[in-house]
């Protein structure tokens, strides 16, 4: 074990100290209710924290509700919402159970690829440039972001990060 001793020793990333170098990478699982954290999701992360992960990353935390559609249609099922303060209590629950077992928590903030399924709007993938394929579906028409939309997305990421911080993540 001496060969791998560094794996189990505490270390710092910036001003955050992790108890070891084991990181649970983000994954999206079917344990949310319309983007809200459920008891099952809290239990899922608690079990990983009990396993002594130094850092647990919550997968697919959407920074915006792109179109406010009902019912929700999305390409990443099981994603958590992070675009409104109403989601903070759920993230607090995850942070509390993970911290109780000594694990730090991070969130994978991401922009959702959600669209209207009504047929009223064309299915467009948003991209930094219309000439660079970057959407989730190859061959799907892409639309370049405007400068105003880019500024809005940057703002949404900042707001979501603040919500995570407020939740103890």
Predicted regions and their residues:
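Flavin-dependent oxidoreductase catalytic cores
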Residues: 1-169
